Amino acid sequence: MVKVYIHDNKVDSDYRAPHNSGTELSLDELAKLGVIYKYCANEEEVNEIARQREYKNRDVVNICEGSFKSEAEFNEKLATFYQEHLHEDEEIRYCLEGAGYFDVRDASTPENWIRCLVESGDLLILPPGIYHRFTLTTSNHIKALRLFKDEPKWQAINRSNQADSLPVRKDYIALINQY
């Protein structure tokens, strides 16, 4: 089951560490950000969600040091994932093995990050337009099923004034202002 809490915002230590401030959050609080969490005991449950949400494509990513040509390439990829960004499409991940952290911006306190620890069986859906970042835990491994409505793509738009003015970002702000 996913663990959700306020990130401690300590930037002087390994971002793969838990960074738990001690302030736990509920799944209802996460839902107010448009983030959907489900525990799925098996892939059949994931398939049902895919059918309901009209996800037509999928792939599996295995992120660990052995997946890259060198430790430097691995660390570079982790740094890329950890840059604050958004997507124009939902980001849907089902953790098959290992663990990772998805950090999402707290809409009510924008200087805060909300950290979600996902482990095997956890499915997380981030809405289009939400600023977020990802990293592994110190175990340095996650195998995840990625679901897509259309052709598989992963286009990150790093946070900037230009990203703030995108229609997808404005739509996201309108969505969370409903709560």
From Swiss-Prot:
The keyword Cytoplasm applies. It is an enzyme of class 1 (oxidoreductase). Binds either 1 Fe or Ni cation per monomer. Iron-binding promotes an acireductone dioxygenase reaction producing 2-keto-4-methylthiobutyrate, while nickel-binding promotes an acireductone dioxygenase reaction producing 3-(methylsulfanyl)propanoate. One of its GO terms (biological process) is L-methionine salvage from methylthioadenosine. Ni(2+) binds at residues 85, 87, 91, 132. HAMAP family: Salvage_MtnD_euk (MF_03154). This is Acireductone dioxygenase.
